[in-house]
């Protein structure tokens, strides 16, 4: 666990150099999951200096505990976005365990971090949040974008 934090912290300094205002971004971050087994439905991270060749962080093991951040115990389809302030990151993931069936996902998880190491999370279950949407069966691969004109972040899936 300590090695993972050291690797991610080192990467965060490379990736988030703009926080100081003196450095430019110097690496790419790729967030991913690896498969359909429970142990594979978790957020992993890899880093690249050129955008083509990536090295998995944390020995290709999860960097977040899916059991802690999700309602199902598994997460898939991570998408990460650097905020307009250049200092904050948002990640959104599907809250799902594929072993429960492909129509079992009703929620997404919203995550926020200032350092790519420490994350806060909130589960958004669409059917519970919006009672008139009971027929909504899937929240697949949510993504985030920023609308400069509206000055708001949006999630679509």
Regions found by a protein language model. Name each.
Residues 1-7:
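Positively charged n-region of N-terminal signal peptides that target proteins for export
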Residues 7-17:
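Sec-dependent N-terminal signal peptides
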Residues 22-157:
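Carbohydrate-active catalytic/glycan-binding domains of CAZyme proteins
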